[in-house]
């Protein structure tokens, strides 16, 4: 990677890590990709289903924002960031982005990403999770080569385009706008809250897994009926 040895910090803002093995495996693999990897002191904390209590996880966010690593990569998703949104120092997070920190993740990280967009903006990265994407064993399918390659290129500034599979005959679209979104369930949960970004003419993307089709349809209908898809 062109930004060889850039600092990458692993942290757990939401669900608890059930095992440290995937975390260690992810750190080792990311190190081999050229990142200088460190692990937040509370990344393996455990309180019930969370990676530490709310105070611990909130302090970790603010601490990481102060450290300003090149990449702040969440270890996993789950649930927990929504509980912190009313107390996050958004200006501190925004200053870290301005200083070059790339906050990366998906799933529950959508709460932080959209919250930051709502409270003054700042570019974040919808991307892989350390343990889920870089911590899998060979028996679990290992690391996806495309994910690995795109992540390295994106974090080094070398990624020029991302391709998607589409139906036969689809000729593509020529549109421009703010690219925003994330996990569909989290996107919907932020509607009518202070942490909902008001985007006009944007391009909304959504992701979700293990949801029944009717739930996906219900969430999309809610966005449509709330006027989000017509903005």
List the predicted regions and their residue ranges.
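ATP/NTP phosphate-donor binding region
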Residues: 1-68
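Short, conserved loop/helix-junction motifs that constitute active-site signature segments
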Residues: 3, 91-99, 226-231
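Short, solvent-exposed amphipathic alpha-helical segments in soluble enzyme
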Residues: 24-29, 89, 219-225
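N-terminal glycine-rich "phosphate-gripper" loop used for MgATP/nucleotide binding
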Residues: 71-87, 106
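Short, acidic/small-residue loops that bind anionic groups at enzyme active sites
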Residues: 90-115, 123-130
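Conserved anion/nucleotide-ligand pocket segment
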Residues: 122-188, 192
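Internal helical hairpin/lid segments
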Residues: 195-231
């Amino acid at each position: 990677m062109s930004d060889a040895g850039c600092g990458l910090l692993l942290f757990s803002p939401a669900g608890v890590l059930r095992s440290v093995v995937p975390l260690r495996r992810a750190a080792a693999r990311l190190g081999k990709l050229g990142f200088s990897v460190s692990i937040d002191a509370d990344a393996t904390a455990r309180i019930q289903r969370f990676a530490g209590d709310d105070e611990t996880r909130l302090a970790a966010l603010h601490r990481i924002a102060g450290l300003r690593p090149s990449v702040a990569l969440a270890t996993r998703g789950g649930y927990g960031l929504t509980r912190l949104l009313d107390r996050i120092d958004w200006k501190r997070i925004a200053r870290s982005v301005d200083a070059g920190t790339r906050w990366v993740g998906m799933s529950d990280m959508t709460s932080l990403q959209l919250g930051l967009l709502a409270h003054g903006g700042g570019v974040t990265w919808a991307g892989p999770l350390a343990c889920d994407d870089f911590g899998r064993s060979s028996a679990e399918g290992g690391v996806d080569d495309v994910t690995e390659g795109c992540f390295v290129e994106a974090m080094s500034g070398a990624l020029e385009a991302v391709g998607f599979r589409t139906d036969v005959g689809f000729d593509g679209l020529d549109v421009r706008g703010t690219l925003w979104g994330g996990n569909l369930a989290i996107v919907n949960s932020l509607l009518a809250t202070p942490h909902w970004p008001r985007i006009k003419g944007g391009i909304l993307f959504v992701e979700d897994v293990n949801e029944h089709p009717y739930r996906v349809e219900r969430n999309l209908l809610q966005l449509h009926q709330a006027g989000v898809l017509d903005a």
